[in-house]
């Protein structure tokens, strides 16, 4: 038992979100412990960051410090911030402290876990790389995800990032019996609200039976103090770890936005008086990123596959924030505005998206060869587009005309109707297995369907649907 009397202190200084607390005895709280300030009408939780000597600690607040004053009473909880975990978290929205913020009453979770935990030991890790099938053709075929890997999601506003995220949440639940945790790190409150509304509409969150929902949401939005934005990723990760380690499930962890996590760490670092590093970032940037990323992995029990939205400041890939993130990524999914404007969804760029899994030793020679042929065909089409724009299709050689024809079919066949978009499009969603994708594209590139019209390949699932659609168009 913690001797509460010896674990109380008083505020000696407040500088914005940073609070210095003096403890009367030498019994100081540990670094990363949560301490609670009693401000009369509200309780403010802070996290201890530094031990200053002379019985003083420096802590960073997780909520606003408005209304706090020197001399206010502070209690050490004896442990890091502890958040609820398990099935009761599904369908709910939490803040960094694990408190529900969706006005649906308390979360009746039986257990809680501290947000600061060690990464799985080396002996617990799964060492054989395996592909995580998503049911989305363009992803599985050209930039496959690693089970327990980290994927960077690049894309501006309005190119379909949210819909892709929701489809992945839906597919992991159906195909893998898994769940998802969404960590909104320093994003707009409006976006968080829109995502919640869209998830309810597409039944990713089941309002009638919350336990049937497929996702738990954790938000630390951009109006919150830097301490909350810095730790909300760990709160989401802790909830995901429980599903992996205790429920032995495959989990998808979305972090939107990993850059805001770095940005919040930079703010906290400056507030704590650390000497800034390159471009003004915190000197501990690589360590902070490593602590978060090393906990995202596959174990012998289950896996956490993480999809992280990556913002590139001023499109500078050498900026320390994206550069540090890239070191941890296994795959990148790049969304293209050009494809979105053509109406090809998901607007994943087949030439810019990459994956370390796309090796013949891992995915097999047939998959690898098919992916390379698709990329070569699309690359040739891209090179010919300038000539087509100036001189027209008729000026191309017979071979090039055939390449262009097949490339346009490939481009359209990479589109796919989504389950979560059924509400908007009216066409039923499709989950396409990897084997069906490989078979379909192989036959297409071998010239088996050169006589079928382009539009028969647009927004269909497997190749048989394209054949049926072509027959319907002719009929």
Swiss-Prot record:
<keyword id="KW-0547">Nucleotide-binding</keyword>
<protein>
    <recommendedName>
        <fullName>ATP synthase subunit beta, chloroplastic</fullName>
        <ecNumber>7.1.2.2</ecNumber>
    </recommendedName>
</protein>
<dbReference type="InterPro" id="IPR003593">
    <property type="entry name" value="AAA+_ATPase"/>
</dbReference>
<comment type="function">
    <text>Produces ATP from ADP in the presence of a proton gradient across the membrane. The catalytic sites are hosted primarily by the beta subunits.</text>
</comment>
<dbReference type="GO" id="GO:0005739">
    <property type="term" value="C:mitochondrion"/>
</dbReference>
<dbReference type="InterPro" id="IPR000194">
    <property type="entry name" value="ATPase_F1/V1/A1_a/bsu_nucl-bd"/>
</dbReference>
<keyword id="KW-0934">Plastid</keyword>
<dbReference type="Pfam" id="PF00006">
    <property type="entry name" value="ATP-synt_ab"/>
</dbReference>
<dbReference type="GO" id="GO:0042776">
    <property type="term" value="P:proton motive force-driven mitochondrial ATP synthesis"/>
</dbReference>
<dbReference type="InterPro" id="IPR004100">
    <property type="entry name" value="ATPase_F1/V1/A1_a/bsu_N"/>
</dbReference>
<dbReference type="InterPro" id="IPR027417">
    <property type="entry name" value="P-loop_NTPase"/>
</dbReference>
<dbReference type="GO" id="GO:0009535">
    <property type="term" value="C:chloroplast thylakoid membrane"/>
</dbReference>
<dbReference type="InterPro" id="IPR036121">
    <property type="entry name" value="ATPase_F1/V1/A1_a/bsu_N_sf"/>
</dbReference>
<dbReference type="InterPro" id="IPR020003">
    <property type="entry name" value="ATPase_a/bsu_AS"/>
</dbReference>
<dbReference type="InterPro" id="IPR050053">
    <property type="entry name" value="ATPase_alpha/beta_chains"/>
</dbReference>
<dbReference type="GO" id="GO:0005524">
    <property type="term" value="F:ATP binding"/>
</dbReference>
<keyword id="KW-0813">Transport</keyword>
<keyword id="KW-0150">Chloroplast</keyword>
<dbReference type="InterPro" id="IPR024034">
    <property type="entry name" value="ATPase_F1/V1_b/a_C"/>
</dbReference>
<dbReference type="Pfam" id="PF22919">
    <property type="entry name" value="ATP-synt_VA_C"/>
</dbReference>
<dbReference type="GO" id="GO:0016887">
    <property type="term" value="F:ATP hydrolysis activity"/>
</dbReference>
<dbReference type="GO" id="GO:0046933">
    <property type="term" value="F:proton-transporting ATP synthase activity, rotational mechanism"/>
</dbReference>
<keyword id="KW-0793">Thylakoid</keyword>
<keyword id="KW-0067">ATP-binding</keyword>
<keyword id="KW-0375">Hydrogen ion transport</keyword>
<keyword id="KW-0066">ATP synthesis</keyword>
<comment type="subunit">
    <text>F-type ATPases have 2 components, CF(1) - the catalytic core - and CF(0) - the membrane proton channel. CF(1) has five subunits: alpha(3), beta(3), gamma(1), delta(1), epsilon(1). CF(0) has four main subunits: a(1), b(1), b'(1) and c(9-12).</text>
</comment>
<dbReference type="Pfam" id="PF02874">
    <property type="entry name" value="ATP-synt_ab_N"/>
</dbReference>
<dbReference type="GO" id="GO:0045259">
    <property type="term" value="C:proton-transporting ATP synthase complex"/>
</dbReference>
<dbReference type="InterPro" id="IPR005722">
    <property type="entry name" value="ATP_synth_F1_bsu"/>
</dbReference>
<feature type="binding site">
    <location>
        <begin position="155"/>
        <end position="162"/>
    </location>
    <ligand>
        <name>ATP</name>
    </ligand>
</feature>
<keyword id="KW-1278">Translocase</keyword>
<keyword id="KW-0139">CF(1)</keyword>
<keyword id="KW-0406">Ion transport</keyword>
<dbReference type="InterPro" id="IPR055190">
    <property type="entry name" value="ATP-synt_VA_C"/>
</dbReference>
<keyword id="KW-0472">Membrane</keyword>
<comment type="similarity">
    <text>Belongs to the ATPase alpha/beta chains family.</text>
</comment>
């Amino acid at each position: 038992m913690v001797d509460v009397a010896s674990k109380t202190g008083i505020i000696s200084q407040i500088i914005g979100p940073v609070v210095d607390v003096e403890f009367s005895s030498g019994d100081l709280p540990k670094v990363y412990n949560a301490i609670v300030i009693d401000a009369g009408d509200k309780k403010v939780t802070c996290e201890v960051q530094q031990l200053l000597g002379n019985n003083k600690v420096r802590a960073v607040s997780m909520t606003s410090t408005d209304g706090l004053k020197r001399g206010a009473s502070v209690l050490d909880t004896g442990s890091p911030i502890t958040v609820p975990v398990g099935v009761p978290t599904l369908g709910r929205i939490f803040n960094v402290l694990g408190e529900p913020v969706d006005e649906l009453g308390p979360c009746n979770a039986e257990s809680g876990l501290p947000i600061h935990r060690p990464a799985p030991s080396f002996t617990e890790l799964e060492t054989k790389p395996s592909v995580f099938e998503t049911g989305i053709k363009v992803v599985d075929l050209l930039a496959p995800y690693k089970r327990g890997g980290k994927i960077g999601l690049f894309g501006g506003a309005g190119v379909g990032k949210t819909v892709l995220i929701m489809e992945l949440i839906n597919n992991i639940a159906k195909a893998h019996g898994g769940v998802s945790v969404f960590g909104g790190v320093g994003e707009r409150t409006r976006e968080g609200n829109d995502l919640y509304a869209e998830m309810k509409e597409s039944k990713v969150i089941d309002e009638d039976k919350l336990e049937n929902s497929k996702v738990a949401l954790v938000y630390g939005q951009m109006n919150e103090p830097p301490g909350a934005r810095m730790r909300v990723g760990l709160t989401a990760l802790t909830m995901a770890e429980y599903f992996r380690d205790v429920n032995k499930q495959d989990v998808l962890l979305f972090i939107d936005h990993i850059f805001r996590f770095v940005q919040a760490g930079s703010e906290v670092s400056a507030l704590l008086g650390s000497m800034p590093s390159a471009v003004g970032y915190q000197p501990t940037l690589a360590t902070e990123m490593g602590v978060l990323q090393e906990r995202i992995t596959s174990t012998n029990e289950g896996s956490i596959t993480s999809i992280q939205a990556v913002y590139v400041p001023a499109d500078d890939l050498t900026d320390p924030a994206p550069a540090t993130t890239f070191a941890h990524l296994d795959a990148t999914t790049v969304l293209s505005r050009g494809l979105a404007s053509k109406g090809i969804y998901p607007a994943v760029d087949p030439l810019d998206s990459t994956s370390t899994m796309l090796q013949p030793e891992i995915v097999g020679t047939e998959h690898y060869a098919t992916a390379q042929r698709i990329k070569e065909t699309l690359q040739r089409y891209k090179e010919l587009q300038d000539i087509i724009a100036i001189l027209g299709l008729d000026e191309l050689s017979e071979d090039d005309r055939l390449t262009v024809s097949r490339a346009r079919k490939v481009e359209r066949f990479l589109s796919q109707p989504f389950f979560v978009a059924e509400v908007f499009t009216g066409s039923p969603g499709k989950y396409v297995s990897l084997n069906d994708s490989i078979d379909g594209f192989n036959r297409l590139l071998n010239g088996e369907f050169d006589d079928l019209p382009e539009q028969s390949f647009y927004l269909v699932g497997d190749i048989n649907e394209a054949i049926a659609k072509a027959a319907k168009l002719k009929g």
